[in-house]
Amino acid sequence: MKILFVAAEGAPFSKTGGLGDVIGALPKSLVKAGHEVAVILPYYDMVEAKFGSQIEDVLHFEVSVGWRRQYCGIKKTVLNGVTFYFIDNQYYFFRGHVYGDFDDGERFAFFQLAAIEAMERIDFIPDLLHVHDYHTAMIPFLLKEKYRWIQAYEDIETVLTIHNLEFQGQFSEGMLGDLFGVGFERYADGTLRWNNCLNWMKAGILYANRVSTVSPSYAHEIMTSQFGCNLDQILKMESGKVSGIVNGIDADLYNPQTDALLDYHFNQEDLSGKAKNKAKLQERVGLPVRADVPLVGIVSRLTRQKGFDVVVESLHHILQEDVQIVLLGTGDPAFEGAFSWFAQIYPDKLSTNITFDVKLAQEIYAACDLFLMPSRFEPCGLSQMMAMRYGTLPLVHEVGGLRDTVRAFNPIEGSGTGFSFDNLSPYWLNWTFQTALDLYRNHPDIWRNLQKQAMESDFSWDTACKSYLDLYHSLVN
């Protein structure tokens, strides 16, 4: 099968979040499964700086962006068997960052038009075209409405993956003519209109052959008013083509037996290396080196979406316990300030690190006993899976991908891979935290069994790849 991905970012070339991880990993797994895979990305200035010497020029042409004629260069490289093509236009993509400009609508309108017109020129007409989030969600619409006259495109099946429904691409309806060069018929009849705006995500949901999300629970949640971001009724209407597939993680990169960022390696049969990493981490972040105290890790953006308003409200109560917490992250200045203040009040119990540090993050995943992740909503989440790979048990709010990946501790069977609570409130966070502390202190054999189950969980991309292939094969025979 010929599969083409079109996305706004993709590791290792450009990455701001989970979308970049998916584009870096899923195509590689599909190639291993025997498929022909290509990816189209914007050619950002950071790509030029880091990978420019490895990328070759292929061709160039002009793209009509409404009344504008814009230069479009095509560049190419091959990595892990995947052919990466880049859309080059320095005016649109040499901005020093991926998102956040006033003209993002024009930038990604150009990118989508260029990607569609590039397919013929690079001689890669896919059986399956997989687009991601609002930045490329207009492509299924454009294929069926603007480019339907191109015979080579007639049999292309499309999949839209929603990584985060909050970001929908809502713009003035004038963009249809001014940038995309199409009529207003589909806006006038309501197909593309939402809240009196052109909504790219709605267009993708209605025009793609299939819609996927990054976990089964999130697929269900976005059809409710609580998580649907005002598109829940549209998603309910299209529910027959909506499904969820949990993202994977790189099982080779996040491997406690080989991780190059760790001082000591270990496995589920021998956790002595984990204990040594714990002592090393305590020393590094300025906490008393104690093997007996439960060490809790947090690696996150410090935002309300991640549940840190509830954590801050609970923190004084939590820190009355004989416990240590190490936090790594940046975000809302109010939360940064709160954690910094608590670290001054409880210097032997809380280490607050307001920064971004890849090595420290990896050490937290590997060395801690518990990993706190009480997100208000979480489409998939990767940190809880990384923590489990290292035998660090997640304590999570049962939502989205957290619900799908963390098996809550069952005291009757003594089974599970972590701890969870359903109602996001200080009371239930504290109650679940106490349950975990009691198990850690009084039932070490059960705790050890949970660690083993967590480390044996399969979150590899090869497993996720099989689910995506089932989805693709439902469209392409």
From Swiss-Prot:
It is an enzyme of class 2 (transferase). It comes from the Bacteria. One of its GO terms (biological process) is glycogen biosynthetic process. SUPFAM superfamilies: UDP-Glycosyltransferase/glycogen phosphorylase. Keywords: Glycogen biosynthesis, Glycosyltransferase, Transferase. InterPro entries: Glyco_trans_1, GS/SS, Starch_synth_cat_dom. Belongs to the glycosyltransferase 1 family. Bacterial/plant glycogen synthase subfamily. This is Glycogen synthase. It comes from Streptococcus pneumoniae (strain 70585).
